[in-house]
């Protein structure tokens, strides 16, 4: 491996609290993109005090990925959270709305070419299809004549009425956008119609409707999503279903092409302020436009209600300036690495607090990156944002005072939990930090990193599953927390435990008097949390929580105890937040998914080539 030492350039001196005016895409501290990863077709919502972004998982070439959402309370630190539904990995352009009539949340997503609608009790679900069967279709293709079904979005009017809009390839003569008014049952339509492309000129896909001062605004995307022609146009009307009047383009590729192909937007309203959230292509631009990232800019209006042209930025926006974040000790640190792919993926990009820049090693095998904090400092939390938050990564974090002698800070070399950020806790006083990537979930992806953030305080605000243990994680004496965020394990202090299959579940059985213990300073009763497990008692499985004496939670420690009777359990979960009743009920009936580790022997460079790239003689 080539060992490269790089020093952060003068650009890194930009204060962490805000990027310089007219920031470039690679300016340290730039606020756009707002998410660390490849996500497209974003719908942003605010429920209560929390922002949610629902988006297509990108970067795979076909929008394949698990059901997920991003959430944040401060609009600065975003956490990726898994959802139970859809159980397909083909989930495009998701949208969530809350229905005032029943208080429920409704989750809309599409597959080509159909729409599915789910219902749940929280913005996170758990979801189930409103029509019963998981794959039941609410809006099939050509449900409205000459409207190709894709990219569904909901709109709730002031009177509580709910409307739905959908469509793609609406450019043909006589085609356009499908639309309809939903019945109160949210399963059928009282009215449907075509909004023709003679009203929404150049309509291609991604309709989004919002209302301001009695005017209905219909925003949509035009041209080709894979190149610079992609843009956002809009039209207005006096009623939700039109007729609409076309007004032109409001968002397009910028002059230097670093905001490339912006489109498929949603709109967030905060008081009298409006913001447009959209995707754009990554920098440098990947082939075929399948590595999109989410950005935000302000949406402003003229006195007559027309929308001003949006000038897309790399600065982004701080919607919650009153909410301060802890100092990131890694920002602008001196960096060394085992290798880097080329100058577009330099190691210092891992310490620049910029979701649009990435350190990528030259190989997809083991790799390391080392940070020099400049002096010995207290280190209690390290957040790592790997390239693909929906895949798990395996890694080791170490600290050192001299760069030669290393102590383990967090060992996740057996990790099987996907997430972003990956959060690791410890208590070190050191100048150097080294993260070594050892493997992952998928072949050929490697250990690329958007950002490494280091804190001198315990930063535990990301809502995550801290413990996740299945029977497969038990080796006879140790129960490894491989599906949980906290690095650690349960140790057998006394007695005997064994793996066995019981009534359809793989489990571990503790013989009478057996004790398993895990210690970690983040465990405890005083902070918000949810602790559950599935236990086998009296011939059947049921859910238990910390009120069961066999789960003894105290500050810094969790004990699993078998008293006079044997204790059979599996799917032990501990969240650092309080679950809603519906979420607990779902966990009671479901098992932790244990993903396979990529075959190390198959790792190598990835080739993606098709006839589209053929030129005569080349």
Identify the residue ranges that each predicted region occupies.
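Beta-rich carbohydrate-recognition and catalytic domains
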Residues: 21-201, 211-257, 272-273, 279-323
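Non-cytosolic beta-sandwich-type ligand-binding/adhesion modules
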Residues: 72, 117-122, 229-238, 377, ...
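Extracellular carbohydrate-recognition regions
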Residues: 313-340, 460-491, 531-533, 584, ...
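Extracellular glycan-recognition surfaces and repeat-rich motifs
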Residues: 339-348, 355, 477-507
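Aromatic, loop-rich ligand-recognition surfaces of beta-strand-rich domains
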Residues: 351-463, 571
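Secreted extracellular polysaccharide-interacting domains
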Residues: 420-421, 509-524, 541
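Flexible glycan-contacting loops in extracellular carbohydrate-active proteins
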Residues: 547-564
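Substrate-binding cleft of secreted/luminal carbohydrate-active enzymes
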Residues: 586-617
């Amino acid at each position: 491996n080539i060992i490269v030492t790089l020093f952060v350039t003068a650009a890194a001196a930009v204060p962490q609290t805000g990027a310089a005016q007219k920031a470039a895409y690679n300016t340290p501290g730039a606020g756009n993109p707002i998410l660390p990863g490849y996500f497209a077709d974003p719908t942003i919502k605010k429920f209560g005090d929390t922002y949610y972004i629902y988006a297509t998982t990108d970067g795979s070439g076909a929008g394949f990925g698990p059901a997920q959402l991003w959430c944040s309370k401060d609009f600065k630190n975003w956490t990726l959270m898994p959802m139970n539904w859809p159980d397909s990995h083909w989930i495009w352009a998701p949208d969530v709305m809350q229905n005032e009539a029943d208080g429920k949340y409704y989750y809309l997503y599409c597959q080509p070419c159909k729409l599915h609608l789910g219902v749940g009790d929280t913005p996170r679900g758990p979801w189930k299809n409103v029509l019963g069967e998981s794959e039941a279709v609410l809006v099939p293709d050509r449900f409205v004549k000459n409207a190709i079904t894709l990219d569904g979005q909901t709109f709730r009017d002031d009177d509580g009425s709910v409307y739905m809009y959908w469509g793609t390839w609406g450019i043909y003569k006589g085609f356009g956008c499908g639309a309809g008014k939903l019945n109160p049952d949210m399963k059928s339509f009282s009215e449907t119609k075509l909004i023709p492309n003679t009203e929404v000129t150049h309509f291609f896909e991604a309709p989004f409707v919002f209302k301001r001062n009695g005017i209905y605004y219909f925003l949509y995307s035009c041209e080709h999503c894979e190149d610079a022609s992609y843009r956002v146009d809009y039209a207005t009307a006096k009623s939700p279903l039109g007729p609409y009047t076309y007004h032109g383009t409001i968002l397009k590729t910028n002059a230097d092409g670093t905001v490339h192909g912006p489109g498929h937007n949603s709109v967030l309203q905060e008081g009298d302020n409006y913001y447009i959230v959209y995707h754009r292509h990554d920098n440098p631009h990947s082939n075929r436009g399948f590595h999109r990232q989410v950005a935000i800019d302000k949406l402003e209006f003229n006195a007559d209600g027309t929308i001003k042209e949006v000038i897309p930025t790399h600065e982004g926006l701080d919607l919650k300036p009153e909410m301060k974040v802890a100092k990131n000790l890694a920002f602008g640190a001196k960096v060394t690495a085992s290798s880097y792919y080329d100058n577009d993926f330099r190691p210092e990009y891992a310490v620049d607090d910029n979701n649009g820049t990435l350190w990528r090693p030259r190989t997809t095998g083991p790799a390391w990156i080392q940070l020099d904090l400049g002096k010995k400092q207290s280190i209690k939390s390290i957040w790592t944002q790997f390239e693909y938050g929906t895949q798990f990564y395996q890694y080791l974090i170490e600290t050192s005072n001299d760069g030669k002698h290393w102590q383990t800070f967090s060992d996740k070399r057996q990790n099987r939990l996907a997430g972003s950020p990956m959060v690791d806790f410890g208590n070190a006083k050191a100048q150097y930090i080294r993260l070594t990537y050892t493997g992952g979930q998928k072949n050929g992806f490697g250990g690329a990193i958007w950002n490494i953030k280091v804190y001198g305080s315990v930063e535990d605000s990301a809502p995550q599953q801290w413990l996740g243990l299945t029977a497969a994680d038990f080796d006879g004496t140790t129960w490894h927390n491989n599906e949980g965020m906290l690095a650690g394990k349960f140790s057998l202090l006394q007695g005997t435990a064994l793996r066995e299959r019981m009534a359809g579940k793989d489990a571990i059985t503790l013989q009478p008097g057996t004790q398993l213990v895990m210690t970690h300073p983040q465990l405890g009763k005083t902070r918000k949390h949810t602790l559950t497990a599935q236990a086998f008692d009296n011939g059947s499985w049921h859910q238990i929580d910390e009120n069961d004496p066999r789960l003894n939670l105290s500050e810094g420690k969790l004990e699993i105890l078998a008293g006079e009777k044997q204790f059979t359990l599996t799917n032990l979960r501990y969240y650092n937040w309080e679950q809603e009743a519906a979420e607990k009920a779902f966990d009671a009936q479901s098992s932790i998914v244990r993903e396979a580790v990529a075959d190390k022997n198959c790792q190598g460079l990835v080739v993606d080539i098709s006839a589209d790239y053929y030129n005569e003689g080349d």
